[in-house]
Amino acid sequence: MSPHQTTGQESDNMTVNGENAQASSQYIQSNEEMTDTIATEKKASAAKAAKDPSRPKRKKAKRACYACQRGHLTCGDERPCQRCIKRGFQDACHDGVRKKAKYLHDAPNEALMAGVGATLYNQRNTAQNNVNASNTSPGAPQQITSPNFYNTQQSPDYNGFPQNKTELQDSTVGPDNYASQSPVSPTYQISQGLSTQGLSPSLPQSTSETPSAANPAPGQFNSTFFDPSDPALFNFDLASMNFGNHYGALEFGMLGHMATGVGDTPPSDSGAQRGSIGQNGSGTFGLTGSSFSESPSNQAPYLFSESGMNDWTQTAPVNRRSMYGSNANLVAGNMSDKPHAFAIESAPANFASPASNESPMMTTSSATFEDTTNSGAFNSRQNVPVSQQRQQPVVSTPQLKQQNLNLGSRRRHKNASSIYDSVKDPYSYTSGFHSLTAFIQRRFSPQKTLRIAKALASIRPSFIATTKTLNRDDLIFMEKCFQRTLWEYEDFINACGTPTIVCRRTGEIAAVGKEFSILTGWKKEVLLGKEPNHNVNTGGSSGLMTGSTSRGSYTPRPYSSEVYNSSATATPRTQPVFLAELLDDDSVIEFYEDFAKLAFGDSRGSVMTTCKLLKYKTKAESDILAGSNGEADAGLNGEATSNETNELNGSHTNGATTNGRGQRRWGKGEIAGEAGMNQLGFRDGKVECSYCWTVKRDVFDIPMLIVMNVSCLFLEPLRSRAMTDIN
């Protein structure tokens, strides 16, 4: 082959290769353009679909199925979901398992299912437990059989109480001696007519359940003592709560149950609705003398149950020594380190209450019954007639409904608009200051009157400067502000357990709490001027006013409309009690000197100091007290009174003794009730207190009202008495 022929073939090959390369580049370029076009069209269609308002929005599913969860795909609530149907394995579509929280690691997966799945799991679990219990050996005891015991069936998966006891021991009876069944279902009821059997020579009475209660149907009561996963315990509808987690729905429902039940259930009913130890219908035992009963008319609380805090007005006096014997001192010894305190019931019908050792909490606080060594003292109580023994009031549904009705009627209607409609005239502060001046001149000596007058004179120019530009409408608005603020403080006074009073800038009492009335003996109606004031205690050397001067002659005093020229047509009003009438001489002087500094000074300031409150005493009470003082003087001269003789002989109860004046002395660690508060200042008519008060101003920056909180100084008398006993 010649060189010229070879060169021609190579040139032809090069031409063909160039054409192929050009065709390939054109094909690649066309593919790229087509890809860009398709992507652009997809973006345009997606943008158009996103902006389309008629396009349905995808609803977020509560829980994805297992396949969609593994593929991180969007799922729906229906089962099988649409993706599983399209992919052809709809039979295997089921809810996916979420990652457990740390506090749910021990919970089974079935219990974490959404909706009612967990409830069905609990029912299947209960049924399985029943099958396992029925397949046990015939020789295994299924019931605790004893003539002296409750024939209750014990749950197979709860071993909180011992199950191997076959008879009542002679030792101390405690809660571990009972294998009772907890009511985990609302349908659980105990018959009220129960037969009695003998327990032991020292405890002769007992009760036994009816056959229906002793042998419950399978699957009805065989669960744990308190199953938190059972929504039927509180009638929760978990399916309607839209929770994906059973435990979360139950917790949310429990919080709602607690929040909606606050303040709606009376104390005597709140304990009877819970399935706790010692409550009504719980299969446990109550204490009433020497018997165990399921009847609500005879049931008393065991240990420190909630039903032990019943209303004090429904409790009869009980001698703890005759009821519990020597074991009554066990709890008293444990309470010796507790601080001295006063307790007031929530909503009493009156201010009369028993002493601390007569309260239901104190009578049921002993953790033991009589043992064999003290059986004689326990059997001696059986000779007492039934009418003389303590009987708990029957708690029935009509009484509870009536109690709820009374509570609802006492609630104040939350509507402040009536204040703006009722206030038509301004309040006559001028008449109030005139009455205060007359009272100060009548009660105090000239030297003390001068000190009070100097304190009031220092703030008088400020009062004149702030009120000289106010017209009648401003004064009416000022009174509306006062009434509106007082209306707001009434809820605080009722909710606060501290003795509280509210008075105007003239010192006239405008509001008072029941604790203050219990402490001082001043009735609310007397303090507000709605009833006559017959107090004769002015804090003198003897504690009482001597002579013919009487306080009832000027309180209540009709209001003179001519004193205030701008309200000539105002309705006459009665005169409330002044704050100065509640304090002794030194406390009154100190109060007005502090008031002169704080009235137009620090608007957020307060005063905290000590004072002596005067007890409310009438002429008849003063005569009785004078007679008791004579007996006390006779006792000091060597003639011991009957109370002092009893005290020397050691006739006291739990450390609370009575002195020669018939006044009860409360020992350390006791909680005195209203009776103990009434005894404060019984002899000299003065109650040593520490109090904190502040001045609240109105919109015109004028002192509007004085809010005062009082606290008893009971620690110092206890300390001084302890030093006297040591010496």
Swiss-Prot record:
UniProt KW Hydrolase keyword: no
GO CC, one annotated term: nucleus
Bias type Low complexity, positions: 380-399, 543-553
Disulfide bonds: none
Domain of life: Eukaryota
Compositionally skewed regions (Basic and acidic residues) per UniProt: 39-55
InterPro entries, alphabetized: ERT1_acuK_gluconeogen_tf (IPR050335), PAS_13 (IPR056751), Zn2-C6_fun-type_DNA-bd_sf (IPR036864), Zn2Cys6_DnaBD (IPR001138)
Biased composition (Polar residues): 1-32, 129-213, 267-277, 361-379, 639-661
GO molecular function list: DNA-binding transcription factor activity, RNA polymerase II-specific; RNA polymerase II transcription regulatory region sequence-specific DNA binding; zinc ion binding
Residues within the DNA-binding region(s): 65-93
Broad class of where this protein is predominantly found: nucleus
UniProt cross-references to Pfam families, sorted A to Z: PAS_13
Region annotated Disordered, chain positions: 1-62, 129-224, 264-297, 353-399, 533-567, 627-666
GO BP field: cellular response to starvation; gluconeogenesis
Keywords attached to this entry: Activator, DNA-binding, Gluconeogenesis, Metal-binding, Nucleus, Transcription, Transcription regulation, Zinc
Subcellular location: Nucleus
Entry annotated with the keyword Lipid metabolism: no
SUPFAM superfamilies the UniProt entry points to: Zn2/Cys6 DNA-binding domain
Family: Belongs to the ERT1/acuK family.
Function: Transcription factor which regulates nonfermentable carbon utilization. Activator of gluconeogenetic genes.
Record-given protein name: Transcription activator of gluconeogenesis TRV_01442
Organism of origin: Trichophyton verrucosum (strain HKI 0517)
